[in-house]
Amino acid sequence: MNASQDTIYAQVSEHISDFQFDSRVAGVFSDMIRRSVPGYTQIINTIGDFADRFVKPNTQVYDLGCSLGAATLSIRRQIQGRDCRIVAVDNSESMVIRCQENLNAYVSDTEVELICGDIRDIHIENASLVVLNFTLQFLPPEDRDALIAKIYQGLNPGGLLVLSEKIRFDDAPIQSVLEELHLDFKRANGYSELEISQKRSALENVMKPDTLSTHQQRLTHQGFSHFSTWFQCFNFASMVAIK
């Protein structure tokens, strides 16, 4: 079996601890997210396309919750020669260590400052692009408005926020069918019923999805005047908001 294959929840566990981005997860994260999040590769690639169009010379880019650096790498490939700086932040030391290894594997003239820290503590300024790629959902709900407000204040006029999230639906039948289709997606990618069940239990207390309308209301309330959901597959979506 490949050491980078996600088998974290493949064995029966009497006690399921809350999910955390520790060294075990960091070691298999690329496999885990590819097999768990429909459209993840497209989202990553398109973040690079957004960067190509929105990142201005001599500005900063923020990847908040950068994990292994997939979005940062996608952005960096598209903004060569613009004298920009990418600030990539994650609060998991294990993720940051592996992210640095991934960044070191490619030569670039774009500086990346990699920070192990809490995204809520990061000062944002002179930003032309901010990315929250499946990150906001792990923050306590009461902290989300303040982070979006900080991002809005730190973005330059015309700057872009890319926000990707697992979402929920107020409409119960829609929630049920899209959630089941997502589970079918995971089954098709080789996850067993045991793995699906145990991971759901691990995430229950740490990931709290919002509805699309909640996201839009939050963004509008903080000042964003342009908003769209550019991608959705089942109960996963990626949104853009322009200042």
Swiss-Prot record:
<comment type="subunit">
    <text>Homodimer.</text>
</comment>
<feature type="binding site">
    <location>
        <position position="200"/>
    </location>
    <ligand>
        <name>S-adenosyl-L-methionine</name>
    </ligand>
</feature>
<feature type="binding site">
    <location>
        <begin position="65"/>
        <end position="67"/>
    </location>
    <ligand>
        <name>S-adenosyl-L-methionine</name>
    </ligand>
</feature>
<feature type="binding site">
    <location>
        <position position="40"/>
    </location>
    <ligand>
        <name>S-adenosyl-L-methionine</name>
    </ligand>
</feature>
<dbReference type="InterPro" id="IPR029063">
    <property type="entry name" value="SAM-dependent_MTases_sf"/>
</dbReference>
<feature type="binding site">
    <location>
        <position position="133"/>
    </location>
    <ligand>
        <name>S-adenosyl-L-methionine</name>
    </ligand>
</feature>
<comment type="function">
    <text>Catalyzes the conversion of S-adenosyl-L-methionine (SAM) to carboxy-S-adenosyl-L-methionine (Cx-SAM).</text>
</comment>
<keyword id="KW-0808">Transferase</keyword>
<feature type="binding site">
    <location>
        <begin position="90"/>
        <end position="91"/>
    </location>
    <ligand>
        <name>S-adenosyl-L-methionine</name>
    </ligand>
</feature>
<protein>
    <recommendedName>
        <fullName>Carboxy-S-adenosyl-L-methionine synthase</fullName>
        <ecNumber>2.1.3.-</ecNumber>
    </recommendedName>
</protein>
<dbReference type="GO" id="GO:1904047">
    <property type="term" value="F:S-adenosyl-L-methionine binding"/>
</dbReference>
<dbReference type="Pfam" id="PF13649">
    <property type="entry name" value="Methyltransf_25"/>
</dbReference>
<keyword id="KW-0949">S-adenosyl-L-methionine</keyword>
<feature type="binding site">
    <location>
        <begin position="118"/>
        <end position="119"/>
    </location>
    <ligand>
        <name>S-adenosyl-L-methionine</name>
    </ligand>
</feature>
<comment type="similarity">
    <text>Belongs to the class I-like SAM-binding methyltransferase superfamily. Cx-SAM synthase family.</text>
</comment>
<dbReference type="GO" id="GO:0016743">
    <property type="term" value="F:carboxyl- or carbamoyltransferase activity"/>
</dbReference>
<dbReference type="InterPro" id="IPR005271">
    <property type="entry name" value="CmoA"/>
</dbReference>
<dbReference type="GO" id="GO:0002098">
    <property type="term" value="P:tRNA wobble uridine modification"/>
</dbReference>
<dbReference type="InterPro" id="IPR041698">
    <property type="entry name" value="Methyltransf_25"/>
</dbReference>
